[in-house]
């Protein structure tokens, strides 16, 4: 049991037990100010005129007084005591909460990275594309996969209670609870998706922290049982209702279930199971049959219902055979394709035909969603036909080409790990022709006349030459679009390169 206690230890010595005083530090709100959209401050008359730490302190004081004549969630967004926009100050305080509560977790993360001696390769650790080399190495040996949607909404009171285990500061969480209930209007017992959407848009930093913390908490329990529990018999997960007393309950878990329940569900350790999470979904893949996958399915359902009080339907978890199911992950469609080949073998005077089945991970670019995104950004219509972008016509020719180059480079870098490159050719064609039509629209000319204009071809050639310097050698073949040549390079079609330094994708704008 000592081993389990060490495994679940939350580095108590590093915990910041006094976060409450930081709420009243002016530099915290200086950091919060820099994270909020500037458009909000334009409506409020500017930072120097209306934002001050004194107003924030007054607003916090009124939260404790419970005076609904001063602070309320009625139809008025104006605080009569402060005279300014209440939503503006609630967003400032939410940013302050997010910055303060992130401090102990950031210190713990930095310390753990230094101890593991992986700080030098931290970029690859953060990379979203590092998932795909993992899939290529592991998924071809697996048979079944389960698509899981992480359920939400979860009540904020449960998040606050779980967060209290990490940071021992009662006044801070009392103030956080008052803020969430008074300003976020989450007094209902079960928050709706509409309220969560409103909260995520008005306070994105705090919302992302609370959501990621919720996911991290359920994954810590899942990984603990996955890595440390073997031949564990359990039927219900109600024993995990209080996270603080997890150690004692875990110690007597097997004994309690063996005595109190006449029927128990065997739970065996699976060494060939793999777990991948991306945004609000996760993937569970295993080499074993569907019987064990169904056990994990019921485990997740009971975990969310009993520990987080989140209702999860069994239909949100689908179990499929990997060779017959495509996984939508990180903007790709991934599946395992079976390649069958026949080998003729001859021994003395006898000839044998041997059928060999090999597995290959196919990662395909979903061209239809990309065309929808390009159409939404006004680069083409819904059918994928390129159109001009007159909004950019006021910019210089160099700026227009640079914008198209940046978008094209981002898309090509991101989808360069695809097994088939035909979709990339079409994306390149749409952006290139949209660029030409935009330039022709700016100069009030036709596409043909613009291309025949002196210096235009050199300008476009410089545009694609700059791209060749950015992309690797096997991607330079895309520059042939400018010269209307075909794509027959076998190396470009077969090679696959994952850019592990991609941390996020830019908007199409």
UniProtKB/Swiss-Prot annotation:
One of its GO terms (cellular component) is chloroplast. It is found in: Plastid, Chloroplast. Its main location: plastid. Keywords: Chloroplast, mRNA processing, Plastid, RNA-binding, tRNA processing. The keyword Transmembrane does not apply. It comes from the Eukaryota. InterPro entries: Domain_X (IPR024937), Maturase_MatK (IPR002866), Maturase_MatK_N (IPR024942). One of its GO terms (biological process) is RNA splicing. GO terms for molecular function: RNA binding. Belongs to the intron maturase 2 family. MatK subfamily. Usually encoded in the trnK tRNA gene intron. Probably assists in splicing its own and other chloroplast group II introns. This is Maturase K. It comes from Trifolium semipilosum. The gene is matK.
């Amino acid at each position: 049991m000592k081993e389990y206690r060490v495994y679940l230890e939350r580095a108590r010595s590093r915990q910041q037990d006094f976060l409450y005083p930081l709420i009243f530090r002016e530099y915290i709100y200086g950091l919060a100010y820099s994270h909020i959209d500037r458009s909000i401050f334009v409506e409020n008359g500017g930072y120097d005129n209306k934002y001050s730490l004194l107003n924030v302190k007054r607003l916090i004081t009124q939260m404790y007084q419970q005076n609904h004549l001063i602070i309320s969630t009625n139809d008025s967004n104006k605080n009569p005591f402060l005279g300014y926009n209440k939503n503006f100050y609630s967003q400032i305080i939410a940013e302050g909460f997010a910055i303060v509560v992130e401090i102990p977790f950031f210190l713990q993360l930095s310390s753990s990275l230094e101890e593991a001696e992986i700080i030098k390769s931290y970029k690859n650790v953060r990379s979203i594309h590092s998932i795909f080399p993992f899939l290529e190495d592991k998924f071809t040996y697996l048979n079944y996969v389960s698509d899981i949607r992480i359920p939400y909404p979860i009540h904020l009171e449960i998040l606050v209670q779980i967060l209290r285990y990490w940071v021992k500061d009662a006044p801070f969480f009392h103030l956080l609870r008052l803020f969430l209930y008074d300003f976020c209007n989450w007094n209902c017992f079960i928050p709706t998706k509409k309220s969560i959407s409103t909260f995520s848009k008005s306070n994105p930093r705090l919302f992302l922290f609370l959501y990621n913390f919720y996911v991290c908490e359920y994954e810590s329990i899942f990984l603990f049982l996955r890595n440390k529990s073997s031949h564990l018999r359990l039927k219900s997960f109600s024993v995990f209702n209080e996270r603080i007393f997890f150690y004692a309950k875990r110690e007597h878990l097997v004994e309690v279930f063996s005595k109190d329940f006449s029927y128990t569900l065997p739970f065996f350790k699976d060494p060939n199971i793999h777990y991948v999470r991306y945004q609000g979904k996760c993937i569970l893949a295993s080499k074993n049959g569907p019987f064990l996958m169904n056990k994990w399915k019921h485990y997740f359902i009971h975990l969310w219902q009993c520990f987080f009080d989140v209702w999860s339907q069994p239909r949100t978890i689908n179990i499929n055979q990997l060779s017959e199911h495509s996984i939508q992950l990180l903007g790709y469609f991934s599946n395992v394709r079976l390649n069958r080949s026949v080998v003729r073998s001859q021994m003395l005077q006898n000839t044998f035909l041997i059928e060999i089945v090999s597995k290959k991970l196919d990662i395909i670019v979903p061209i239809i969603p990309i065309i929808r995104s390009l159409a939404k950004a006004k680069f083409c219509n819904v059918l994928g036909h390129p159109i001009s972008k007159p909004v950019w016509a006021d910019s210089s020719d160099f700026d227009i080409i640079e914008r198209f180059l940046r978008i094209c480079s981002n898309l090509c870098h991101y989808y360069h790990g695809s097994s088939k490159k035909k979709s990339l050719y079409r994306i390149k064609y749409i952006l290139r022709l949209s660029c030409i039509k935009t330039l022709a629209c700016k100069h009030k000319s036709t596409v043909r006349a613009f291309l025949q204009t002196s210096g235009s071809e050199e300008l476009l050639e410089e545009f694609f030459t700059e791209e060749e310097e950015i992309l690797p050698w096997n991607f330079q073949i895309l520059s042939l679009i400018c010269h209307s040549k075909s794509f027959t390079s076998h190396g470009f079609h077969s090679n696959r390169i994952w850019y592990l330094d991609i941390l996020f994708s830019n908007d199409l704008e």
